[in-house]
């Protein structure tokens, strides 16, 4: 079954009490007065940033073949401690934290391996050699399974305990970012055909094909409240979908280049999106209105909101004055620089 993107009441559909509360909260967040801080440590550009489930640690994955874990104080200016995770022999393209454990992190690399690390010791505890260069990775919300996508459009699902493949599937089309919904019963794949393929989990049977965009879909984010998913596309648009109806309820139009990365904040009231445009857009999910733009100096690779605070980590292709990779990421949302 194919679902056409019918747009439901595009500007500000009837709001629930909860949504009104989120809009009230917007008035309390002085985005214009907030600052970004730089975090330097990698030798080459950073491809991926991700927060742990408690919002106290941030991991960064880099072309320099390492990941790093940083202790972040949301309200402090304390000394930033970081620990290096070494072992991959190619770029660390994406990483994600165990949603139930604040110190376990999984990394996907071009060296064909997926590794599980303990962020306290910096040691690799599990490793799986897969069939191709891994570029996308995500955890099931209960922390029991990890899904990995590679450059050859193959999906592998690993059992976290044994670190062995449970499912393998090769697709005959371009598969980009992947995600479970908040229940873990639905698995979503973005594709180069402009669709989102919706599969039931664990059977991986096709439930739906959502015709989301006129160009390839690159990235996907799930609203933490489980109400929506958002899709970023090569057509420069971000679309917002009601997950129960599979209807498009909003589009965000501020970017002009293919959307590379998107993220919902912890309330689900804001969405950040980034591309090769030299700013990150933050928009109100319910009104579709852009509320702030964070200037950047390069194309962005990864944005992710903290799960507890309005802190947004972001990383891109920043160069220094000698045109070498800066190896930096930044966090926006501090009251002082």
Segments predicted by a language model, with ranges:
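WD40-repeat beta-propellers
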Residues: 67-72, 114-118, 155-159, 196-200, ...
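A short beta-strand motif characteristic of beta-propeller blades
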Residues: 36-38, 81-84, 123-127, 164-169, ...
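Intrinsically disordered, low-complexity acidic/Ser/Thr/Pro-rich linker and tail segments
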Residues: 1-43, 48
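Loop/turn segments within WD40 beta-propeller blades
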Residues: 49-55, 96-102, 138-143, 179-185, ...
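WD40/WD-repeat beta-propeller blade N-cap
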Residues: 39-46, 85-92, 128-134, 169-175, ...
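Blade-level signature of beta-propeller repeat domains, shared across WD40, Kelch, NHL, RCC1
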Residues: 301-337
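Conserved strand-to-loop turn within each blade of WD40 beta-propeller repeats
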Residues: 61-64, 107-111, 149-152, 190-193, ...
């Amino acid at each position: 079954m194919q679902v056409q993107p019918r747009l439901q009441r595009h500007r500000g559909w009837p709001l629930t009490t909860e949504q009104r509360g989120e809009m009230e909260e917007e008035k309390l967040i002085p985005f214009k007065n907030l600052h970004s801080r730089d975090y330097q440590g990698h030798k080459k550009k950073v491809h991926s940033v991700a927060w742990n489930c408690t919002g106290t640690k941030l991991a960064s994955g880099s072309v320099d073949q390492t990941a790093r874990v940083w202790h972040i104080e949301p309200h402090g200016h304390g000394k930033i401690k970081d620990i290096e995770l070494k072992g991959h022999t190619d770029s660390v393209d994406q990483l994600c934290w165990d949603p139930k454990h604040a110190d376990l992190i999984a990394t996907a690399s071009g060296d064909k391996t997926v590794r599980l690390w303990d962020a306290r010791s910096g040691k690799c505890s599990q490793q799986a050699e897969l069939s191709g260069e891994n570029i996308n990775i995500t955890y099931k919300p209960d922390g029991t399974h990890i899904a990995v996508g590679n450059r050859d459009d193959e999906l592998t699902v690993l059992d976290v305990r044994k670190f062995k493949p449970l499912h393998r599937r090769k697709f005959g089309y371009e598969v980009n970012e992947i995600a479970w919904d908040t229940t873990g019963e639905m698995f979503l794949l973005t594709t180069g055909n402009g669709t989102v393929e919706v599969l039931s989990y664990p059977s991986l049977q096709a439930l739906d094909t959502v015709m989301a965009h006129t160009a390839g879909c690159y990235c996907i984010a799930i609203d933490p409240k489980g109400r929506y998913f958002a899709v970023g596309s090569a057509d420069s648009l971000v679309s917002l979908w009601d997950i129960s109806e599979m209807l498009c309820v909003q589009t965000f139009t501020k970017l002009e280049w293919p959307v590379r990365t998107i993220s919902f904040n912890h309330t689900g009231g804001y969405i950040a999106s980034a591309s090769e445009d030299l700013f990150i857009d933050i928009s109100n999910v319910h009104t579709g209105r852009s509320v702030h733009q964070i200037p950047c100096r390069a194309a962005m690779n990864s944005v992710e909101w903290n799960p507890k605070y309005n802190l947004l980590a972001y990383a891109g292709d920043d160069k220094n004055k000698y045109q070498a990779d800066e190896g930096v990421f930044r966090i926006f949302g501090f009251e002082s620089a």
